[in-house]
Amino acid sequence: SIAKHQSKTTIGAHNIFLGQVRADAIDSKTVSAIEYTAYEDMANAKFYEIREATFEKFNLTCMHIYHSLGKVNTGEICLFVFVSSPRRKEVFKALEYVVEEIKAKAPVFGKEIFEDTTHQWKVNI
């Protein structure tokens, strides 16, 4: 669907955020993956609310949000956010806003899995 944006001639800028799972060291253990779970209906409803609030706050033409579910290994992408606008400053501000809203409000839960197979629930900061 992103390729279709070429025909939208009022768009002057696109911005993309790719969230990637890091191999964080926590208490002498290294993260090897994060297993994401969600109440999908609730998460989709929250993504919709965030999307609509972002369209109200910023002059955007288009937005796409995709969050992984299941096991995502370190180095792999877990979150994709794409925004389009007539102006570049809008896409920079909007993208930061949307990512922070997702991190703070979306009911998506991450279980950090360590190399030794132990785990802990991730705290978003």
Feature roles, as predicted:
Residues 1-77, 86, 92-125:
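N-terminal, polar/charged subdomain of small-to-medium soluble alpha/beta proteins
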Residues 82-84:
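Short hydrophobic/aromatic beta-strand micro-patches
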